[in-house]
């Protein structure tokens, strides 16, 4: 009879009709964490691809396609380069005394005056761009014995001949060109930028017809520097009907210093000075349209948001911009490790804890409880552990941005042909910096992701251990993130476990009694040995029946002949 009872008990267990803990005297409580059907793969220090519930993209890979005019003051060069505006090309007169944070040069810009070159073009362009102003002050230079205000048909201002408005072309007066020696002190408390030039005629005849002397000379000095230029007479490629050229030079005069100009011909004299300012203004080549909008970061492709720490839109930037990296994507984990919920668990879909899988549909928290008791099933989030994890993760993105955003601009680098080796070195340095930052960015994100996953796992374990300490011997760890509670635990009891007010002493006697009864069937009542012996006997009996049946079948077919001898 005891054997029959034991077999009946086992049969009920298999079919799930009588599960210890599923009756009114027991309950099951599982701890779990949030999960989503399709997570996001991120990289950590220990794993190239690990799935998390949520992640934030850190690389800005696209621009708005337009340059925002706020908060930076943008000056659109339109048809003018910065140097043409500086010299006073007639079609750039509208830029006189302009100011800017960023001067935007267009690919369609052109010169429309006397052909010129600037031996140190990049330095002059960068100097004026960083000053952020074309403020010009006219000074009373005295040029005695020469003709002033020379002009050319190649540089029309209105219907007649013209010239650069910031320069004064000096030629012979009657048949003489005396030696010029002019000084101009700087009695102000700021630097002054003087632009001057040297005319290179195309022929000797042009040289003498303009300056009398067969060869001129221009010397410009300060206490700190001196430049002497000898004109190079000779024909050059024709530009706007001219084969002669003007070379543009510049001199900075510090406060208390003196500008000295000495020449016996070929001088393109300054009319005054540009007031130099220090600042973070800059210049950028771009064909992106300028629009009314707000953006702190500008690239030649257009403005980009600076709410991400990295960007791969363009190396050239202006403003507070994300750091340029080579990667197209870097994802920062802002959620926990994702273990999608299994669709079926066991014969009747019993609940399971975090060790087996996560829980989908937990919209009110990252961590929580599920239970089965005499009143049914239920689920609730644990807001305290959820908030503890969120508080530590929320600041991650801002901290990464603070570490990486540049509060300065990366200007364009230009070099003349004779500075080719310097240009190559500069390119190598910039490429090395980008490689280094790209590596640092990947490492930084991997470290942060590792910390996030470890942190969220730790919060889950803390909640589990807290629950274990409350239940003590009143429940058994089922090994999958669940506890089998060996006493009647209604919804109020479950709530007390969740909020930390559970008193295990109240249920201790009931739990011990139920534990003994349930475990007795399994281990203490002798049923285990009976079950083993009965299973062995039945197996042997079935084996004998099968063997005997085979022998009888073989005898009937004549495959086996049995002789009985007496």
Curated annotation (Swiss-Prot):
Keyword Disulfide bond attached: yes
SUPFAM superfamilies: Influenza hemagglutinin (stalk), Viral protein domain
Residues carrying sugar: 24, 38, 54, 97, 181, 301, 499
Record-linked HAMAP family: INFV_HEMA (MF_04072)
Keyword Transmembrane helix: yes
PTM remark: Palmitoylated.
Descriptive protein name: Hemagglutinin
Cystine residue pairs: 30-482, 68-293, 80-92, 113-155, 297-321, 489-493
Function: Binds to sialic acid-containing receptors on the cell surface, bringing about the attachment of the virus particle to the cell. This attachment induces virion internalization of about two third of the virus particles through clathrin-dependent endocytosis and about one third through a clathrin- and caveolin-independent pathway. Plays a major role in the determination of host range restriction and virulence. Class I viral fusion protein.
Extracellular compartment spans: 17-530
Gene Ontology cellular component annotations, sorted alphabetically: host cell plasma membrane; membrane; viral envelope; virion membrane
Lineage: Viruses, Riboviria, Orthornavirae, Negarnaviricota, Polyploviricotina
The species this protein was found in: Influenza A virus (strain A/Memphis/1/1971 H3N2)
GO molecular function: host cell surface receptor binding
Assembly mode: Homotrimer of disulfide-linked HA1-HA2.
Cytoplasmic-side positions: 552-566
Site description Cleavage, residues in chain: 345-346
Membrane topology: Single-pass type I membrane protein
